[in-house]
Amino acid sequence: MKLIVAAVGTRMPGWVETAWDDYAKRLPADCALELREIKPEPRTSGKTPAQMMAAEARRIETAQPPGVLRIALDERGRDLTTVALSQQLEKWRAGGRDVAFLVGGPDGLDAALKASCEGLLRLSSLTLPHPMVRVLLAEQLYRAWAIMTNHPYHRA
């Protein structure tokens, strides 16, 4: 199974890349973590936020392989514990499909794109900066895998 994070934004601070790479390297090949950075729509183009989100949604769509199970990150999404995320990860793995986690830009994700996803996931009730979302998601996916495989990383 491949875990794909399709995230709007291309210029992240160095600490984000370092943290992302660390968690991606820890995961085994049968649960590979892959980042697909999506070019954000320029905010100076005179377009409405809805038009910008629609343009970004088209880019997100083209960045995903066919048949992938899509989960949108959204503040109104399902709130899971780490153990519940691990159980969900196991179900996804048993289903045999790759999973793409979609992360929007400054204005969020296009409503039609969210509606087309198999699920909505919320990482926190707090508003998180986009660089932090990448790192937090990578860490939680690694932790979920650790729980699933009884790896000592998660000591609950």
From Swiss-Prot:
Keywords in alphabetical order: Cytoplasm, Methyltransferase, rRNA processing, S-adenosyl-L-methionine, Transferase
Protein family per UniProt: Belongs to the RNA methyltransferase RlmH family.
Quaternary structure annotation from Swiss-Prot or TrEMBL: Homodimer.
Job of this protein: Specifically methylates the pseudouridine at position 1915 (m3Psi1915) in 23S rRNA.
Enzyme Commission designation: 2.1.1.177
GO-annotated cellular components: cytoplasm
Catalytic activity: pseudouridine(1915) in 23S rRNA + S-adenosyl-L-methionine = N(3)-methylpseudouridine(1915) in 23S rRNA + S-adenosyl-L-homocysteine + H(+)
Residues bound to S-adenosyl-L-methionine: L73, G104, L123, S124, S125, L126, T127, L128
A GO molecular-function descriptor: rRNA (pseudouridine-N3-)-methyltransferase activity
InterPro entries according to UniProt: Alpha/beta_knot_MTases (IPR029028), RlmH-like (IPR003742), tRNA_m1G_MTases_N (IPR029026)
Broadest EC class assigned to this enzyme: transferase
Protein name (database record): Ribosomal RNA large subunit methyltransferase H
Gene designation: rlmH
UniProt key word Methyltransferase: yes
Compartments (UniProt record): Cytoplasm
